[in-house]
Regions:
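Short, surface-exposed, polar/charged, turn-prone segments marking secondary-structure boundaries
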Residues: 82-89, 123-125, 136-142, 178
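Structural signature of Gram-negative outer-membrane beta-barrels, strongest in the C-terminal barrel
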Residues: 1-117
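Intrinsic disorder/low-complexity detector
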Residues: 10, 16-17, 70, 95, ...
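Outer-membrane beta-barrel translocator domains and adjoining extracellular loop/strand segments
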Residues: 2, 67-74, 79, 121-129, ...
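Short clusters of hydrophobic/aromatic residues that line enzyme substrate/ligand-binding pockets
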Residues: 62, 67, 86, 121-122, ...
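Gram-negative outer-membrane beta-barrel transporters
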Residues: 106-117, 135-193
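Short C-terminal domain-edge/linker segments immediately following a structured domain
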Residues: 75-76, 89-93, 128-130, 141-145
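Extracellular loop and loop/strand-boundary signature of outer-membrane beta-barrel proteins
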Residues: 23-31, 79-85, 132-138, 182-192
Length: 193
C-alpha cells in the first residue's frame, strides 16, 4: 500500500507506518515444503465368464505438504499457533467392484464398494481470531465408506431406447481431531464428500 511503501520514507525505523511483517511473524520460517516416500497399488481381477469381471484393489495416496503464509500467528489464548509447514496427508483405500453384461448384453451394470482411511487430513481453516488469512493444517483423521454404480439398459423390444443411471452413497466421519478448531468436530461428516 502507499502507506506501507512511502510512509516510512526518511524514517529512522521501518515500522513507522504499519506493521513490520518480519516482527509480526518472527521465527524459523521454512521456504520449501518437501515430501518423499513410497506409495503402493495392487489389483486382482477375476473373469468367471464372458459377462462378468470382478476386481479388488488396494491403493495408497497422499497430498504433499505445503507452506502457510500466516505461519506463526497464534490464537488470543496462545494455545494454538499456525504451523509454518504442514505434513502430507495419507489415504489407504480398499475397493471391491464388478463389471457385468446381463440379459443377453442388453443391460450393463458396474459398481463398487469401498473403504478409505485418511490420516492427518489437510484442511483449510479460516479463523479470524487467529489471522485474517486462510491457513491449512493437518486437522483430523477420517474414514470414508461407500457404494457406487452405474447402468446402461437398451431393451431389445424398444429399438433406439437407452436408459442410463448412476448412484453413489457415501458415509464419511471424522474419527480423530488433531487441530483444535470449531471447523473440525469429532464424528462430523467430511464437507463436500
Amino acid at each position: 500500500s502507499a502507506a506501507g511503501s512511502f510512509g516510512n520514507f526518511g524514517a529512522t525505523t521501518d515500522n513507522n507506518a504499519g506493521n513490520n511483517l518480519d516482527t509480526l511473524f518472527a521465527g524459523p520460517r521454512p521456504d520449501t515444503a518437501s515430501t518423499d516416500g513410497v506409495i503402493t497399488k495392487a489389483s486382482v481381477t477375476w473373469t468367471p465368464n464372458d459377462n462378468q469381471l470382478l476386481y479388488a484393489t488396494f491403493s495408497e495416496g497422499y497430498r504433499p505438504g505445503l507452506l502457510n503464509r500466516p505461519g506463526g500467528a497464534t490464537n488470543p489464548a496462545g494455545t494454538f499457533t499456525v504451523p509454518y509447514a504442514i505434513d502430507t496427508d495419507d489415504m489407504t483405500n480398499y475397493e471391491f467392484g464388478w463389471k457385468t453384461d446381463l440379459l443377453d448384453y442388453t443391460l450393463r451394470f458396474n459398481g463398487s464398494v469401498f473403504f478409505a482411511e485418511i490420516e492427518r487430513l489437510q484442511t483449510t481453516i479460516f479463523d479470524p481470531s487467529i489471522t485474517n488469512l486462510f491457513f491449512s493444517d493437518n486437522a483430523a483423521d477420517a474414514e470414508i465408506k461407500g457404494v457406487e454404480g452405474d447402468f446402461i439398459w437398451a431393451p431389445p423390444s424398444m429399438s433406439g431406447l437407452t436408459v442410463t443411471g448412476a448412484f453413489s452413497v457415501l458415509d464419511t466421519e471424522i474419527t480423530r481431531v488433531i487441530t483444535p478448531t470449531n471447523d473440525v468436530t469429532l464424528g462430523d461428516s467430511l464437507a463436500y464428500a
